[in-house]
A protein has these predicted regions:
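Conserved catalytic cores of ATP-dependent inositol ring kinases
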Residues: 1-366
């Protein structure tokens, strides 16, 4: 067992109800020097459903790009909206959206007993272990957009009020976290926040179901610390093992306030501080790397008028190139949907969005 990370390493069968025999199960990349990178853990999206249907312009919001609908009616074959009562849905069978790195082996590596990377093998090897804190059967429910009983709005022709459409994508997927990395001589463990100890993550919540809504009972985890041990000490002393080095992380939720997947009044998980300790000596805590961010929005009372670098969440806050664009700068109070063009009076403020992080003056040298 991991003396720091209480989560168990998960063993996953190569063939399950959704991991089919004909699916790719492992990818190996061979480098020019003979070293092999083994991506042996396929991470699955088990459900993906894309739905579009006729929608009512009267309950659409052009500013947010969302339209309300009646679940069980509008998003079914019983749709009666618009001129064509359109409803369409496409479901994609389970597929691997990522392959996680499970091992790096040298050109002369030999698996002595055929049981994967172990200490009795010949050659150099690094093994990556993963965990699923919520168990093998847990699937994270995701949806775009996340808002309950709302869909992404497509206005169609402005002169035709009967051709408006709504759409959403819903799915379920596996969630894996890195548990530990080990070589023959060293091991690094990755400790996640523990909700049972009140260490709650307040963003990245999932969806209640296909019709959306933030499910605050479905939180993800964040990385709390990384501990590096001598493997001999780790194996011999278990919980009494002393880490050679520990990396600590501290967060808040000050960026992207108002994102629907966060708790009320919170933004996205934001890295604020990193510090290192050695052999459980806490002196390094006095010399952390501190990350500072500009105030959130020039239009919010009390914020710095010269530092509007980090605005709140805006689902339509982008131009036709995908770059951030505040619709309040558009002529005649037009929305970005109606005026998707890049503003020609750009300034340093617009160019600096999300790049305003800087190290605090008192941070220690790297």
């Amino acid at each position: 067992p991991n003396p720091v990370n209480s989560e168990a390493i998960i063993a996953e069968s190569r063939v399950t109800s959704f991991r089919k025999k004909h699916h790719l199960s492992e990818i190996t990349v061979l480098n020019a020097d003979g070293r092999r990178y083994v991506y042996g853990l396929p991470v699955y999206n088990t459900i993906q459903k894309e739905v579009s249907f006729s929608a009512d312009k009267a309950v659409a919001d052009i500013q947010t790009g969302l339209v309300e609908y009646t679940p069980g009616t509008d998003n079914t074959i019983r749709n009666t909206k618009g001129k064509d009562n359109f409803y369409g849905a496409e479901e994609i069978p389970a597929y691997a959206h990522s392959f996680l790195l499970t091992g790096i082996v040298s050109a002369d590596y030999t698996d002595k007993t055929g049981d994967g990377i172990t200490d009795d093998d010949m050659g150099d090897a690094v093994k990556f272990n993963y965990c699923r804190p919520y168990g093998n059967n847990y699937m994270f429910r995701w949806r775009t957009p996340l808002a309950e009983n709302k869909a992404t709005y497509s206005e169609g022709l402005k002169t035709d009020y009967s051709d408006d459409k709504g759409s959403y994508i819903y799915g379920q997927k596996e969630i894996w976290y890195l548990h530990s990395i080990e070589s023959k001589s060293m091991i690094a463990t990755f400790t996640l926040n523990d909700p049972q100890r009140g260490e709650l993550r307040e963003d990245a919540f999932g969806s209640k179901g296909e019709n959306g809504g933030t499910d605050m009972q479905q939180p993800l985890r964040y990385l709390k610390q990384i501990d590096v041990y001598s493997k001999a000490d780790y194996v011999k002393n278990k919980e009494a093992a002393k880490p050679v080095k520990t990396v600590h992380f501290e967060y808040n939720y000050e960026l992207c306030l108002g994102v629907p997947s966060s708790a009320p009044g919170k933004g996205k998980l934001t890295l604020k501080k990193i510090w290192f300790t050695y052999n459980k000596n806490n002196k390094g805590q006095k010399k952390p790397y501190v990350f500072l961010y500009h105030p959130k929005d020039i239009n919010d009372p009390g914020s710095d008028p010269k530092a509007a670098y980090n605005p709140g969440y805006d689902p339509k806050g982008f131009d036709r190139w995908g770059n951030y664009k505040d619709a309040r700068n558009n002529p005649a109070q037009m929305s970005n949907a109606d005026y998707p063009y890049t503003l020609q009076n750009g300034n340093e403020t617009n160019n600096g969005k999300w790049d305003s992080t800087k190290a605090a003056m008192h941070a220690a040298a790297w």
